[in-house]
Amino acid sequence: MAMALPMPGPQEAVVFEDVAVYFTRIEWSCLAPDQQALYRDVMLENYGNLASLGFLVAKPALISLLEQGEEPGALILQVAEQSVAKASLCTDSRMEAGIMESPLQRKLSRQAGLPGTVWGCLPWGHPVGGHPAPPHPHGGPEDGSDKPTHPRAREHSASPRVLQEDLGRPVGSSAPRYRCVCGKAFRYNSLLLRHQIIHTGAKPFQCTECGKAFKQSSILLRHQLIHTEEKPFQCGECGKAFRQSTQLAAHHRVHTRERPYACGECGKAFSRSSRLLQHQKFHTGEKPFACTECGKAFCRRFTLNEHGRIHSGERPYRCLRCGQRFIRGSSLLKHHRLHAQEGAQDGGVGQGALLGAAQRPQAGDPPHECPVCGRPFRHNSLLLLHLRLHTGEKPFECAECGKAFGRKSNLTLHQKIHTKEKPFACTECGKAFRRSYTLNEHYRLHSGERPYRCRACGRACSRLSTLIQHQKVHGREPGEDTEGRRAPCWAS
């Protein structure tokens, strides 16, 4: 177990008083309700950290009151009276004694802005709980008056702004005083105790709904939003709400088109760091997701799940027009192009009709469902992009040759033809290609792999296009039996 090692000096015993903060009744009454709630949360979290590390024997009386939801009241006053010598020290004396001001004290002091009082250091001569203050250590007045004699005390009494500036400054030396056995140093015991939970693996904060435990109370509060379905962070552009501010910040990049995460290898930029990490696996060749049936590995878990359907025979994608089922969604999209072409020739499916149907969802339907094929989408923007497959709309046109595309990514890929860029090179023979999947097809020439097999004669092919061309020998058109092209029995 990691122990607290003060720097410098011998090892100190950690008790609740090291991380506790006490107030007088006057100070407590100056706090707003949200500040009092902050005090309760921090005290309970500090106690939980100590308990998880095994430093506590008996539960402090302050914690018992806070757990019951009662006001600390008289207990705070009693502790303050017992600690009047500490509370009466001026700022210089506190620095000499090595008394460190906690972050909670500074935060509450800045929020409260108590005039004439440095937090935990009353104006000299101010009675605490009816008890007179002891003689001033710097030769201050002994007549019981509450006039400040400290050089900065008069400024504090006159200007709350100067007080807040002082409260924002660390008291004492800025060097860390507590060091963990792992080498990391902290200025406060409470921060060290929170860090030590990493080494112990303790998770003292448990969710009452599902039983899941967490290392910090802040993470527990964030988790509990899942059960309450509360989404306090709302986008000002589209109104979509999120549970976390980080999710909202990532969502904003959809509207601003900002892509701050760039790949160091190829320069491609992404709006989220997770997508950049996923992309970098293509350069490193890392394939962490392996199939338990055949051992084949993949870069993405989604691709592994698709591959698993080859072994299980599952075909979750069904065409609503003809009932044909497919393993992959991409196969279904290719199949729908046949229906879209037929509908365009008959005048039955047009862009306006599809968009109108998409904007008129029926009762009980998902909010974003394709009116032609029934495929659901989480966002309306994805549905509109998908509808171009049915309408044949191609808004992205090449400035060089005038060829149009339904997606900007396809246009970018096409433009490599004009720039003659071929970023994907074979490591065996050095031949380069514009597309990664063309390189993968080329690799089969070296490996001898032929995954596409004809059902009629059993002939295997290394490319899908070669198999489609071969099927014409048996009297099949390329558009027929689209499902069979990627069926499990076709793979060798």
Curated annotation (Swiss-Prot):
PROSITE patterns: KRAB (PS50805), ZINC_FINGER_C2H2_1 (PS00028), ZINC_FINGER_C2H2_2 (PS50157). Keywords: DNA-binding, Metal-binding, Nucleus, Repeat, Transcription, Transcription regulation, Zinc, Zinc-finger. CDD domains: KRAB_A-box. Its main location: nucleus. Residues 139-168, 474-486 have a biased composition (Basic and acidic residues). GO terms for cellular component: nucleus. GO terms for molecular function: DNA-binding transcription factor activity, RNA polymerase II-specific; RNA polymerase II transcription regulatory region sequence-specific DNA binding; zinc ion binding. It is found in: Nucleus. It comes from the Eukaryota. InterPro entries: C2H2-ZF_domain (IPR050752), KRAB (IPR001909), KRAB_dom_sf (IPR036051), Znf_C2H2_sf (IPR036236), Znf_C2H2_type (IPR013087). The keyword Metal-binding applies. This is Zinc finger protein 517. It comes from Homo sapiens. The lineage of its organism: Eukaryota, Metazoa, Chordata, Craniata, Vertebrata.
